[in-house]
């Protein structure tokens, strides 16, 4: 299913022209229009899901191999020092277009791009409590 008002549905399905770097039956990968770095790409499923929570398992199983292909192409093309493969869910996590997508961002030492966080220092008891809560939710 696609959504009529979703820009990423339209880009993934060729309704609007864009810079396509990869396409198969399920996905289109395009250059980000507002890149964090040269070569920053978005992997877009052709079928609409707002986020990871709604993504069909069969689509989820196929997206990481595509991300791997894109990351390898970035490494080969740009000889970058690393590649971020990132996926955001909901506005609080940085999602700005509500169509599931994965970012691939070529990275270089000292490129000034900050996607890192300050590591926390939870106690063993806090970790045990958090672990139990998540395990219970997975039951």
Task: Spell out what each predicted region is.
Residues 1-139:
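HIT superfamily nucleotide-processing domains
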């Amino acid at each position: 299913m696609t959504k009529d008002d979703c820009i990423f549905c339209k880009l993934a399905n060729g309704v609007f022209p864009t810079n396509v770097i990869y396409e198969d039956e399920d996905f289109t990968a395009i250059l980000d229009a507002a890149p964090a770095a040269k070569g920053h790409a978005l992997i877009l499923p052709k079928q609409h899901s707002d986020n990871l929570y709604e993504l069909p398992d069969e689509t989820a199983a196929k997206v990481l191999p595509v991300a791997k292909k894109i990351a390898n192409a970035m490494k080969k093309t740009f000889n970058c020092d690393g590649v971020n493969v990132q996926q955001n869910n909901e506005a609080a996590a940085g999602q700005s277009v509500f169509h599931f997508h994965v970012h691939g961002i070529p990275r270089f030492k000292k490129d000034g791009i900050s996607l890192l966080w300050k590591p926390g220092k939870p106690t063993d008891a806090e970790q045990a409590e958090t672990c139990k809560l998540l395990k219970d939710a997975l039951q």
